[in-house]
Regions:
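Accessible peptide chain termini
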Residues: 1-2, 54
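Charged, low-complexity intrinsically disordered regions
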Residues: 31-224
Length: 224
């Protein structure tokens, strides 16, 4: 009995020490990586509820979990925020992970516009499906908006080219806001102190996705 108690005590002490070391390692690695990208980063920071609902991607009954929140500014005044996001549908069931990004543009779009992968059953009663004169783009994405003219202002060839590189993303534009959700399916970007971050760097996918979100935001900000 004493032996079992000792083993359990030893197990919990070791586990606590390991988890504490993991947190310190993650915080150091993430803060350093974000600093090089000129982002403000809070490893355990959460994103607010309102932007999630305002994006039009999620319903109010969904349960959200977010962390690894970051923020910054580009183009001399366009503020952005992102976070790792977990979503659970309390009614229909199902969980999915990804990255949620939103930014405030210098100008506003004429009408709300949604760009979503064809594999997603997207519905919005306020928007109609808009035909895009690009067969390759139409194979992957559907666009919902007000009219062809306002959508054409957004979907320039440069914008489409960048968007085509990453298929599993949802984009919505409302007023002067852009919202992007990347359905990466990755539930854990944190580096493991027991593994070499040179050979296995879990931050790189997150960094790559955020940089593409910023690039898309820059293109859109200049188009409006």
């Amino acid at each position: 009995m004493i032996c079992l108690s000792f083993v359990l005590s030893y197990y919990f002490v070791v586990r606590f020490a390991r988890d504490k070391m993991q947190r310190k390692f993650s915080m150091f690695f993430q803060s350093t990586a974000f600093e090089k990208c000129s982002f403000d980063c809070d490893l355990y920071g959460e994103i607010e509820f309102d932007p999630l609902i305002q994006s039009g991607f999620f319903k109010k009954h969904y349960a959200f979990y977010s962390d690894m929140q970051g923020s910054g500014e580009i183009c001399g005044g366009v503020k952005f925020e992102f976070a790792r996001l977990g979503v659970h549908d309390d009614i229909n069931g199902g969980d999915f992970w990804g990255i949620f990004f939103h930014a405030t543009l210098e100008k506003s779009v004429k009408q709300a516009t949604f760009i979503v992968p064809n594999e997603i059953g997207f519905e919005n009663k306020k928007c109609k499906k808009v035909a895009i004169n690009d067969s390759e783009f139409n194979k992957i994405f559907s666009v919902f908006g007000g009219d062809t003219e306002s959508v054409a202002q957004i979907l320039t060839p440069k914008f489409i080219k960048r968007l085509m590189k990453f298929e599993k993303r949802l984009i919505s534009l409302t007023d002067n806001k852009i919202y992007i959700f990347l359905n990466t399916g990755l539930g854990d970007f944190e580096p493991k102190f027991s593994k070499s971050v040179l050979r296995e760097n879990p931050f790189l996918p997150l960094k790559r996705e955020i940089l593409h979100c910023l690039f898309i935001t820059k293109i859109l900000n200049s188009n409006l």
